Amino acid sequence: MLKPLGNRVIIKRVESEQTTKSGIVLTEKAKEKSNEGKVIAVGPGRLLDNGERVTPEVKEGDTVVFEQYAGSEVQVGEDKYLVISEEEVLAIVQ
């Protein structure tokens, strides 16, 4: 498993719908990548110049919305994850 460093967050994307509202089935190429996902792991937080750490606002298990082109995609086995900085998280879904 991946262990994020600093203010980074590991996210598993939530798959987007495979059919449109009108019933059209989308192929893998036609589907847009979702910018919503579940937080799998959270780093210890950003380190400040004075040596203190900023506690992350997100936690494991949160469903979040993040910037469209955020982070780097990483594959571990069959699973794909997104590694992003916490600043790229826009909101927590409640």
Curated annotation (Swiss-Prot):
Major localization class: cytoplasm
Matching PROSITE patterns: CHAPERONINS_CPN10 (PS00681)
GO molecular function, one term: protein-folding chaperone binding
Cellular component GO terms held in the UniProt record: cytoplasm
Keywords: Chaperone, Cytoplasm
Top-level taxon: Bacteria
GO biological process: chaperone cofactor-dependent protein refolding
InterPro entries: Chaperonin_GroES (IPR020818), Chaperonin_GroES_sf (IPR037124), Chaprnonin_Cpn10_CS (IPR018369), GroES-like_sf (IPR011032)
Subcellular location: Cytoplasm
Function according to Swiss-Prot or TrEMBL: Together with the chaperonin GroEL, plays an essential role in assisting protein folding. The GroEL-GroES system forms a nano-cage that allows encapsulation of the non-native substrate proteins and provides a physical environment optimized to promote and accelerate protein folding. GroES binds to the apical surface of the GroEL ring, thereby capping the opening of the GroEL channel.
Similarity-based family: Belongs to the GroES chaperonin family.
Subunit structure: Heptamer of 7 subunits arranged in a ring. Interacts with the chaperonin GroEL.
Protein name stated in the entry: Co-chaperonin GroES
Species for this entry: Staphylococcus carnosus (strain TM300)
Gene that specifies this protein: groES
